[in-house]
Swiss-Prot record:
Gene encoding the protein: rpsD
Protein known as: Small ribosomal subunit protein uS4
GO cellular component: small ribosomal subunit
Protein's UniProt keywords contain Cell inner membrane: no
Biased composition (Polar residues): 42-53
Positions of the UniProt region annotated as Disordered: 32-55
Known function: One of the primary rRNA binding proteins, it binds directly to 16S rRNA where it nucleates assembly of the body of the 30S subunit.
InterPro entries xref list: Ribosomal_uS4, Ribosomal_uS4_bac-type, Ribosomal_uS4_CS, Ribosomal_uS4_N, S4_RNA-bd, S4_RNA-bd_sf
Protein family according to the UniProt entry: Belongs to the universal ribosomal protein uS4 family.
GO molecular function: rRNA binding; structural constituent of ribosome
Gene3D superfamilies xrefs: Ribosomal Protein S4 Delta 41, Chain A, domain 1 (1.10.1050.10), RNA-binding S4 domain (3.10.290.10)
Top-level taxon: Bacteria
Keywords, ordered alphabetically: Ribonucleoprotein, Ribosomal protein, RNA-binding, rRNA-binding
């Protein structure tokens, strides 16, 4: 399956919630009606969604939030199931620990897609070494920074300014003057923002 490159707001409308696919420069609720499905007048149906349909929608929503394709997502779930603890929470922690997501959480990219592009274009270093692998798992204590030659990019400066206004997650420590941050630890479930019901995904894969 190819990566979706169409209108981002349409995906959020389809899921009925903000998937944080667009920059925070303007509230998504101001741009489109999240309670209206895509289509000329919003698609409606009187039929009740099945349990399977609800579970599938939740999986699709999480895949879209993190920009992960089906095969990758299955691998993440298999790893989450193998680890000790709650499988659903493990899954979200693995997704949150992706380098592209950490770059986004540290405020170097205004969206996960932009953060992924920064990584792919070798604008990010981890512990002093350039990394261009968005799916790289960041570990506690790792230092993630913007390369010296990229620090003056307008999009990075703007993203960092917006992130500072909104506040950084507690599980990263960011020095905006140095354009670097430390991944302190994996986030707790309560630290992970977003309207996600990971138990539905566990139920889906347990069928």
């Amino acid at each position: 399956m190819a990566r979706y490159i169409g209108p981002k707001a349409k995906l959020s409308r389809r899921e009925g919630t903000d998937l944080f696919l667009k920059s925070a420069r303007r509230s998504l609720a101001d741009k489109c009606k999240l309670d209206s499905k895509p289509g000329q007048h919003g698609r409606t149906s009187g039929a009740r969604t099945s349990d399977y349909g609800t579970q599938l929608r939740e999986k699709q929503k999480v895949k879209r939030i993190y920009g992960v394709l089906e095969r990758q997502f299955r691998r993440y779930f298999a790893e989450a199931d193998r680890l000790k603890g709650n499988t659903g929470e493990n899954l979200l922690q693995l997704l949150e620990s992706r380098l592209d997501n950490v770059v986004y959480r540290m405020g170097f990219g205004s969206t996960r897609a932009e953060a992924r592009q920064l990584v792919s274009h070798k604008a990010i270093v981890v512990n002093g070494v350039v990394s261009n692998i968005p799916s790289m798992q960041v570990k506690a204590g790792d230092v993630v920074a913007v390369r010296e030659t990229k620090k003056k990019q307008a999009r990075i400066l703007e993203a960092l300014s917006l992130a500072e206004q909104g506040g950084m997650p507690s599980w990263v420590a960011v020095d905006s003057k140095k354009f670097e941050g430390t991944f302190k630890q994996k986030p707790e479930r309560s630290d992970i923002a977003g309207d996600i019901n990971e138990s539905l995904i566990v139920e889906l894969y347990s069928r």
